[in-house]
């Protein structure tokens, strides 16, 4: 493989620049995207794109991003550097020679907790400590809220406790209670912290990853950068096949967002893909390997219990989770509970030393709407609630994964049961897909369900691309999935009544009514596509100031007609006001004329 540095997408989005807000409790600078608008003040929006859209920063992925958190971590006095485990051929799927992806060149010694301490954000929050990470996310969540204080709250939040203004203390309380998490491994020092919780903005995750048959390090790093450019808040690396360790290292060292994994996938590669040969020792070693690299959250399918597996026998689509099917096969072969369930407390002990958050996997999620809300799904959910309490007792951060395929009328039940059984831990759902009849369009079938469940209280939505059920998504699929899910998340924020959420909508609506085409493009989630579509029929620069588009033309544009009506009404109103003055004066108004010279 060519070890040269791959080309990475950089540069700001149209009419945009990076601005920073200074912290008050800690020496931090929180990045935001500022969009210039003609004849209006600039609009600041939440920005997860990291330094890649900052013209003041030079990107070299062979060096990785800046170590922005190192000083925060060391100042707490509870971490230590150590040599870490030795990387072996098995960690990269026995890739060798030209097939071996080069190791990331700028290696650091990993950090871990001193002694038996917990270095998690939950542990600090419970101790009453407001960390830099907590203040960082509070500032991010407050974008637009100061202006929104002037407006009346509008929305239905289904019992959430969304504040008018997010303070660092509010963040601390939410973390301490388990209602929110900040995925922030102490070895992911390049991270720009973000928060996942019901009382905060709805977040989205993008999945990337190579497979045994396709993709490379270059593609995966670019897919990560590409996905956060368009708004992904976290990225999951679901790589299988060769080079898993090295590809993951390149991704994390260049990722400003949290990175999640399913460690079971790599553990399975280490035993040649034979599920029955998996052991606790192999899995434990894989957890430590990934924790040392800086993985921020692990999907752990510990809720798949032996007695639940027969409940899936009558399903239309059986067990569709890769992790769930692997553990079900292991349990049946050994006729015992999974090592994930039996050793869950030991998994917690590993996670608390690095602050790796749990994403408790829904291994028995429904893979078709026919299987939605069945006994297997909800039996596992109850177990996930039990595991949540065990993790919380160890000061570990937890979120709960959810379905899947669920028709619209059954979605609310999923949210209600999750809140009940999992004690308000953040919910993280894949969609859900609301119908099964649209291969190639499952980004749409799932966005319908995602918007609904986000409104009901889900904290993070895992994107679905047009390639779902069909193949590995490419760069364009990733963008389509991210944009679609940003729409769903934003729609949920609006419906919940998040203060400030509507400011961007209103700014774009004003631009639309005033025929400010460039502002319309730039304020949208995807300026490039909006501009390209307009250019298809009206490509000239003069068309960018026209008071019509190709849909209606100049004579039938409803907004142009509205302008004419408004102008006529204002003229008529002016005449009426003048007539009223005449009536009040009781005489006609006679203008004064200058005397003739």
UniProtKB/Swiss-Prot annotation:
Catalytic activity from the UniProt record: 5-amino-1-(5-phospho-beta-D-ribosyl)imidazole + S-adenosyl-L-methionine = 4-amino-2-methyl-5-(phosphooxymethyl)pyrimidine + CO + 5'-deoxyadenosine + formate + L-methionine + 3 H(+)
One Pfam assignment: ThiC-associated
Cofactor binding, note field: Binds 1 [4Fe-4S] cluster per subunit. The cluster is coordinated with 3 cysteines and an exchangeable S-adenosyl-L-methionine.
Assigned EC number: 4.1.99.17
Annotated positions binding substrate: 207, 236, 265, 301, 321-323, 362-365, 401, 428
Pathway the protein takes part in: Cofactor biosynthesis; thiamine diphosphate biosynthesis
Molecular function terms from GO: 4 iron, 4 sulfur cluster binding; carbon-carbon lyase activity; zinc ion binding
Gene Ontology cellular component terms for the protein in this record: cytosol
Function: Catalyzes the synthesis of the hydroxymethylpyrimidine phosphate (HMP-P) moiety of thiamine from aminoimidazole ribotide (AIR) in a radical S-adenosyl-L-methionine (SAM)-dependent reaction.
HAMAP family tied to this protein: ThiC
PANTHER family, per database record: PHOSPHOMETHYLPYRIMIDINE SYNTHASE, CHLOROPLASTIC (PTHR30557:SF1), THIAMINE BIOSYNTHESIS PROTEIN THIC (PTHR30557)
Name used for this protein in its record: Phosphomethylpyrimidine synthase
